[in-house]
């Protein structure tokens, strides 16, 4: 799932899908990072957006250590944990990693949220 927000308004969203054949090419979930990042960037371009249009990037989820719901800056430790997948291999582990790669290319901040209520809280903070 991807979405672009302008402050608190969800401007556009999509559910990008991948075939079983595409996914089967990868041994680990983290190996899918570049493929999924490229799909998101291609989708943005198709919709008329560039990385320079972004002010921040937010990923969602990941099987991380126990922590309260909320918004967290993506750190090197968080990235290490998401790649190592100590808590399990899951596509949600890619949320913070993809956000980090896109933010790095755009030269902007990157964050990860734990759940849907964290997203709602983040939107409220932006109002």
Show which residues each predicted segment covers.
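Short, well-ordered amphipathic alpha-helical segments that serve as non-catalytic structural scaffolds
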Residues: 35-47
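A generic structural motif
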Residues: 6-11, 52-53, 108
């Amino acid at each position: 799932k991807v979405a672009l927000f302008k402050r608190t308004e969800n401007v556009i969203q999509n559910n990008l899908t991948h075939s079983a054949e595409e996914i089967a090419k990868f041994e680990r979930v983290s190996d899918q990072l570049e493929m999924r990042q490229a799909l998101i960037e291609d989708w943005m371009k198709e919709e008329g957006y560039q990385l320079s249009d972004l002010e921040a990037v937010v990923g969602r989820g990941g099987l991380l250590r126990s922590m309260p719901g909320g918004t967290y800056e993506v750190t090197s430790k968080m990235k290490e944990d998401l790649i190592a997948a100590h808590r399990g291999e899951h596509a949600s582990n890619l949320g913070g990693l993809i956000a980090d790669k896109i933010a790095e290319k755009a030269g902007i901040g990157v964050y990860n949220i734990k759940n849907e209520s964290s997203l709602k809280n983040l939107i409220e903070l932006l109002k």
